Amino acid sequence: MAKRSKAYQQAAELVDRARLYAPLEAAELAKKTAKVKMDPTVEVAMRLGVDPRKADQMVRGTVNLPHGTGKTARVIVFAVGDKAAEAEAAGADAVGSEDLIERIQGGWLDFDAAIATPDQMAKVGKIARVLGPRGLMPNPKTGTVTPNVTKAVADIKGGKINFRVDKQANLHIVIGKASFDTDKLVENYAAALDEILRAKPSTSKGRYLKKVTFTTTMGPGIPVDPNRTRNLLEPAQV
């Protein structure tokens, strides 16, 4: 196991691994344990009580974070003609069709989200094996296969993000930056949590939220009480 830095060890000492923190306390602690010289991302990791190998237990969806992620997403759009012009006017970072597909086949993946008009999906299917595992494949369920490219680009640039459980039943979602006010981090978490709870498969049995952890880039994990799904701006009850 790689040796942790002194800064990491000092930050880890602030976290009581034997307790479950209220979301408000976890957000405050995430800010305290973040590296001062940078503005790291604050992320939530969840372990869900689902079996992603079963098609009816796949958890995926979108959430509009009320305070955004602190980062302007890089968005590409697969479109031609008037729709391509609309995407460019909306602020898409790259727009194209076959040329964009060839660029991605060549190894370019410098973007955070991909949108496609319905007529482009047959072509985009050529790179499904590249985009799919990275959570970048356009999908009607997440609003990224749509003729309304203007709205789709604006939504993602404004803080709309996708979430999807992985093969190990883990789910990761960004809720902001360490520089955010604590309340804003918690409000973003609340918005994400609501959507993730809403996406619970009807076939999922037992506890749905098994484990929740807050963490910052290169920071220690902070265990959060998975039972706290309401009144998230309140401290832990003693």
UniProtKB/Swiss-Prot annotation:
Coiled coil: none
GO CC field: large ribosomal subunit
InterPro entries: Ribosom_uL1_bac-type, Ribosomal_uL1, Ribosomal_uL1-like, Ribosomal_uL1/biogenesis, Ribosomal_uL1_3-a/b-sand, Ribosomal_uL1_CS
Keywords: Repressor, Ribonucleoprotein, Ribosomal protein, RNA-binding, rRNA-binding, Translation regulation, tRNA-binding
GO molecular function, one term: rRNA binding
A Pfam family annotated for this UniProt entry: Ribosomal_L1
GO biological process, one term: regulation of translation
HAMAP family according to UniProt: Ribosomal_uL1_B
NCBIfam families in alphabetical order: rplA_bact
Role: Binds directly to 23S rRNA. The L1 stalk is quite mobile in the ribosome, and is involved in E site tRNA release.
Family assignment from sequence similarity: Belongs to the universal ribosomal protein uL1 family.
Assembly information from the UniProt record: Part of the 50S ribosomal subunit.
Protein name: Large ribosomal subunit protein uL1
Gene name of the encoded protein: rplA
